[in-house]
Structures are given as structure tokens and as C-alpha cells.
């Protein structure tokens, strides 16, 4: 995707997010861009039918998630985004995954690179993020380009709670 289209897409997708979450995602994007990376928000808000389809095809483990959150009158208030490396959208390098996780954590967000990892492997990933170690022996969770809000559960978000 050309640079102008990538930036326009990111700005449009940020409007699908809850404002405080969007500001954090924007900061993550800026951090990665400062390192010469071209992050692209692939998905922010996702409709319930699209979420069910993702669940049914094994791309999600939940039928309702942070991507599906809405506010008053059904306004999109996503609390998750899938942030791809625009130069490697189908096969993100380990370096990108580790740098994305570090930037997400630095801005109070939770990276999907931890999803599905037992505690014993989470420690190794945390150390890799801290040390910016891109070693292929480090295990990565099942949704490495996903980042989401912290401090609330999916059920709380569905019931109307939002991050502060």
C-alpha cells in the first residue's frame, strides 16, 4: 500500500476505536514509524457477523471480543486493532512482532503475541521484548499483530466499561 493510503487508512480505522484507546494506538504507530516501520491497521471495529465468521474459521477464539465493542446507538468503539507491518502483511518478521509488543506495552496496551502461551513461555517473551531479542527460539502467541486495551474484561467492555 502506498504511504498516503496507509496513513489515510490508519486515520480512518482510528475513528472506529474508543477515543482513549485510539490515542494509545496512534502513539504505538508513531513509535514504530520512528523506527522505519510502516504499520497498518488492518482491522479495528468488526461487526458481530464478521466476528462469528472469524470464530468459525479459527481466526478468533471468542464470539464477541474487543473488536466488537460499540457505544451509544451502535457507534463503533473498538478496543482492539490488528496492526500489520505494511511491508510484510502476510508474514511479519519476528523483529516487527517484538517491537510491536514493546510499543504496545509502553502505551498500556496488551499484545496478542502473548495469547495462548503458558506462563513459562510468557517470561521468555517478556524478556525478549525488554532486550529487543529477535531470536527465533522465542515462542510467540497465536495473534501477534493484535493489540488491545487493558484494565477490563471483554464482558465489562460489552457492558459499557471503557479504559481510562
Regions found by a protein language model. Name each.
Residues 1-43:
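Active-site acidic/histidine clusters and adjacent loop/turn architecture
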Residues 1-3, 20, 43-46, 50-58, ...:
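N-terminal-biased segments
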Residues 8-12, 35, 42, 51, ...:
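Residue-identity detector for glutamine
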Residues 29-61, 111:
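Extended, low-complexity, intrinsically disordered C-terminal regulatory tails
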Residues 64:
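An exposed tryptophan-centered "aromatic clamp" motif
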Residues 67-164:
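Catalytic cores and adjacent binding grooves of peptidoglycan-active enzymes
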Amino acid at each position: 500500500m502506498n504511504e498516503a493510503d496507509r496513513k489515510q487508512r490508519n486515520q480512518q480505522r482510528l475513528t472506529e476505536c474508543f477515543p482513549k484507546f485510539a490515542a494509545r494506538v496512534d502513539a504505538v504507530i508513531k513509535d514504530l514509524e520512528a523506527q522505519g516501520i510502516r504499520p497498518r491497521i488492518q482491522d479495528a471495529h468488526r461487526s458481530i457477523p464478521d466476528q462469528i465468521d472469524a470464530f468459525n474459521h479459527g481466526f478468533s477464539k471468542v464470539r464477541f471480543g474487543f473488536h466488537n465493542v460499540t457505544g451509544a446507538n451502535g457507534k463503533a468503539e473498538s478496543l482492539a486493532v490488528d496492526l500489520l507491518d505494511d511491508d510484510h502483511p502476510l508474514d511479519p518478521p519476528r523483529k516487527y512482532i517484538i517491537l510491536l509488543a514493546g510499543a504496545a506495552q509502553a502505551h498500556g496496551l496488551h499484545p496478542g503475541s502473548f495469547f495462548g502461551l503458558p506462563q513459562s513461555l510468557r517470561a521468555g517473551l517478556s524478556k525478549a521484548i525488554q532486550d529487543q531479542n529477535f531470536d527465533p527460539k522465542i515462542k510467540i502467541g497465536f495473534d501477534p499483530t493484535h493489540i488491545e486495551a487493558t484494565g477490563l474484561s471483554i464482558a465489562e467492555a460489552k457492558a459499557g466499561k471503557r479504559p481510562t
